Design a protein with these regions (language model features):
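Conserved N-terminal beta1-alpha1 strand-loop-helix module at the mouth
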Residues: 1-95
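Conserved small/polar residues in nucleotide/adenosyl-binding loops
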Residues: 99-101
Length: 101
């Protein structure tokens, strides 16, 4: 089966629906993008676990933007999830461009 180099956005209100999409499409895509609504859902752990089980890439689109120290702390708190990609807005200053993820 051909696997496309694309991400599927999982931005539905229901994580049950998001998980269903992962189970149906994981063989065909490169990864899944999880945004605010899906990530801050009270069942996001299930969604993240399903993406990890699928062996697809995880893109957390949380648009981290604040002062450098706060963004760095946010990234540290996400390290247990180990996302493959993360949205980081660096308009907070030169220090943000030096953060190692």
């Amino acid at each position: 089966m051909k696997k496309f180099k694309s991400f599927i956005a999982l931005d539905l209100k229901s994580n049950t629906q998001n998980i269903s999409i992962v189970k149906k499409l994981y063989l065909h895509v490169y990864g899944f993008k999880v945004g605010y609504r899906s990530f801050y859902n009270n069942r996001s752990n299930e969604l993240i676990s399903e993406i990890k089980r699928s062996k697809c890439k995880l893109f957390l689109d949380l648009k981290l933007h604040d002062i450098p120290n706060t963004v760095s702390s946010a990234i540290d708190s996400l390290s247990n999830i180990n996302p493959d990609f993360l949205t980081l807005h660096i308009s907070g200053g030169k220090e943000l461009s030096l953060i190692h993820i």
